[in-house]
Amino acid sequence: MYKIYSYLGWRIDMKTENLPQAGQEAQIDKKIHFIWVGHIMPQKNIQVVSEWAEKNPGYETIIWVDKKIAPAKELDLFILDMKSKGITVKDINEEGVCRDSIRHELDQESPNYGMVSDMLRLNILAAEGGIYLDSDILCSAPFPDEIYAPFGFLLSPWSQGANNTLCNDIILCSKGNQIIQQLADAIEQSYIARDSFEFTHEYASMKETKGERIAKTLGVTGPGFLFHQLKKMGILNDKSEMEAIHWELQDQRYLIDGSVKEPDYFYVPQNNTNDASWVPSIKRPGIENMSFQERLENAVQLIAFDIQKTGLFNLDHYANELKVKQNSWCIAAETSPELKPDSYLLIRPRDKTGEWTLYYVDEDKKLNPVTLPVIKGAIKLSEVSDPLRKFHTLLSQVSDPVNPTAHELKQIGRALIELKPRQDEWHCKNKWSGAEEIAQELWQRITSNETLRAQIKQCFTQFESLKPRVAELGLTRASGAGTEVEAHESTVKEQEIISQNTVGEEGTKEKNSVQLASENSSDEKIKTAHDLIDEIIQDVIQLDGKLGLLGGNTRQLEDGRVINIPNGAAMIFDDYKKYKQGELTAESALESMIKIAKLSNQLNRHTFFNQRQPETGQFYKKVAAIDLQTTIAAEYDNNHGLRI
């Protein structure tokens, strides 16, 4: 049996037999919930919440905060101010709504507040019932004195112009509602499994871009999660993929009215543009006042949670969060008043044709100018080639920071040409000197716990990729880890010695013959790689205009035509340009393209994104599946009947 219900301006085809309160209408508790964890709520959001409280005196208006990390003095003043406006402030830690997964994310050095809010709203509603609202939704009219919802649970549609999913910016439910409780349990598991949605360990230390953070949040805890979890629970009609959900928006306005007639109540988002303000990439408050030892202990607890709950060991990520900023550098329009000793300060010119000035900051915080050539026509920062890390490495290798040699200046100048930062990223952070030492201390602390040491062995993907770094840092592996590898390496070396002693002159002749054949085949292999690159780029061009949720970037073709392609495809196109300009070999370009495709495929594989632009998903899968050596060898075999 199916029923169509109209509410919040949308209609949803629901399987009533799978609903816990089938055939019932439940009254929504008279509470309006807002969430603001981290820093103190900005004034513009306070005004919005205050208006809700003023226009709905019959409802209890609540703002949920995190007293563990909010600035204490500012929070006390905030609580008093809200009390004067008739608004209650509650602490998530005291009310039993802050699960371990939520605390884990909040304790990160740069928490994803969007994910935290997604998880909190479900737990709060499960515990107290009522209405959850994002703090940027304006109130144009009061709520009705009584609101009854079919089965005690309602969601709003996606508010950014999409037409195929739900949203979680407005949620209504009755206290103890079983649907919301199941969603609260499921969202925690989705968060714990979030690393399957992230990039691989190889990229754990790279700065997460805004687009990546948006995608991960939407898919792991946001609207994408809601839609697919409700389908999984059997609440949404599964006769078709997306056709089960329909709604009608009135000029992007939310309808809070149970009737089918013209809406009486409209609630309009304060900002109807997707500016990602709900996923800020900022340090949590108070982190600057914590001692290094306190931050280290916090990191140990976070790593333990990851190992026990997610089965992943992200040592590199936490080491970089704790990195010591020595021999660091920053970019500024003018001299910073807070200079750090033993660092570099790069002053950008006020106009595009001006000269970049590099200073070395000594122990006394004195600026020592480092002469540099005039830098013009700087290339846009490439996230793949990572010139920031290259530039930092060059700086750390300068023999005399105050008086670098002419050769060192030339190298730094070349690195600067690749270093044109984005206008909103003057302060760029990478692997600072000291991360290796921190990684070593973290490793020793974690592996000193026998239980964690045993669990680390089960973190196959992360642990395997960590082994080379462990050897490089001279760290002690967990007991028994790597023994088989070392034994295998010893056996291989013995076999090599025996082979070298028995080859003789015939072996030498054969070696020369193979070498000649290899040289003759080199050009053919390069041609095969070139053809493969051309094929990939033709597929990229076909993606013109096929943009997904995160938008795209424009690129100019050789014929002058400008195409607008998805972000991952744009990065692949950038590698193609570098290959054409001789900056990358064919094999290096292909390796980078495949790597980008694998990362993009991980983001795009979620059904929520893949259904928006299936051509993009198919392209990423195709490139990601390429086995470079096998493909080139197979092509050469087909053409020449030879095995390379």
Curated annotation (Swiss-Prot):
Keywords: Glycosyltransferase, Secreted, Transferase, Ubl conjugation, Virulence. Its EC number is 2.4.1.-. It comes from the Bacteria. Transmembrane segments: none annotated. The keyword Ubl conjugation applies. Its main location: secreted. Disruption phenotype: Cells lacking this gene grow similarly to wild-type L.pneumophila in both murine bone marrow-derived macrophages and the soil amoeba Dictyostelium discoideum, indicating that SetA is not required for efficient intracellular replication of L.pneumophila in host cells under laboratory growth conditions. GO terms for molecular function: mannosyltransferase activity. One of its GO terms (biological process) is mannosyl-inositol phosphorylceramide biosynthetic process. Ubiquitinated and polyubiquitinated when ectopically produced in both yeast and mammalian cells; however it is unsure if this modification occurs during the L.pneumophila infection of host cells. Coiled coil: none annotated. It is found in: Secreted. Pfam families: Gly_transf_sug. Induction: Is induced in the post-exponential phase of growth. Residues 1-400 are annotated as: Glucosyltransferase. Residues 401-644 are annotated as: PtdIns(3)P-binding and localization domain. InterPro entries: Glycosyltransferase_domain, GlycoTrfase_DXD_sugar-bd_CS, Nucleotide-diphossugar_trans. GO terms for cellular component: extracellular region; membrane. It is an enzyme of class 2 (transferase). Multidomain protein with an N-terminal glucosyltransferase domain and a C-terminal phosphatidylinositol 3-phosphate-binding domain, which guides the Legionella effector to the surface of the Legionella-containing vacuole. Both domains are essential for the cellular effects on the eukaryotic host. Secreted effector that interferes with vesicular trafficking of host cells. Possesses glucohydrolase and mono-O-glucosyltransferase activity by using UDP-glucose as a sugar donor substrate. Is able to glucosylate histones H4 and H3.1 in vitro, but it is unlikely that histones are the natural substrates for SetA. May glycosylate a component of the host cell vesicle trafficking machinery during L.pneumophila infection. Production of SetA in yeast is extremely toxic, it causes a severe growth defect and alters yeast cell morphology. When expressed in mammalian cells, SetA causes cell retractation. This is Subversion of eukaryotic traffic protein A. The gene is setA.
